[in-house]
């Protein structure tokens, strides 16, 4: 029971952080979170499905806290947005995108794999 309450509070805090200045989206997120927990209220706490649901909701909280950043367009004439970054926002360096791993060009027996353009 306490794990469920902890997960519920965790995801609500993450939603509050991610959607801080967007009252409509924050309200929709809170309603969706509440509905999800209400649907799971009747489950047996010892059921394996409860553990899966708790892992899922903690994952959602992590993504909301670290990956979701909202932007606001201040001037309609410009394509510039003010991003609402916070201390938990994950900043990547894109190094893995700049140098992707080499793609295999041969099949299992050393034969060239046919491509759709060949």
UniProtKB/Swiss-Prot annotation:
Annotated GO MF terms: protein folding chaperone
Example GO biological process: mitochondrial respiratory chain complex III assembly
Basic residues: compositionally biased ranges: 106-118
Keywords, alphabetical: Chaperone, Mitochondrion, Transit peptide
Compositional bias per record (Basic and acidic residues), positions renumbered to this chain: 74-90
Ranges where the record places region Disordered: 70-118
Main location: mitochondrion
CDD domains listed in its UniProt record: Complex1_LYR_LYRM7
GO cellular component term, pick one: mitochondrial matrix
Intracellular or extracellular location(s): Mitochondrion matrix
Superkingdom: Eukaryota
InterPro entries in the cross-refs: Complex1_LYR_LYRM7 (IPR045298), MZM1/LYRM7 (IPR050435)
Disulfide bridges in this chain: none
Complexes and interactors: Interacts with RIP1.
Role this protein plays: Assembly factor required for Rieske Fe-S protein RIP1 incorporation into the cytochrome b-c1 (CIII) complex. Functions as a chaperone, binding to this subunit within the mitochondrial matrix and stabilizing it prior to its translocation and insertion into the late CIII dimeric intermediate within the mitochondrial inner membrane. Modulates the mitochondrial matrix zinc pool.
Family: Belongs to the complex I LYR family. MZM1 subfamily.
Designated name of the protein: Mitochondrial zinc maintenance protein 1, mitochondrial
Organism encoding this protein: Yarrowia lipolytica (strain CLIB 122 / E 150) (Yeast)
Phylogenetic placement of the source organism: Eukaryota, Fungi, Dikarya, Ascomycota, Saccharomycotina
Name of encoding gene: MZM1
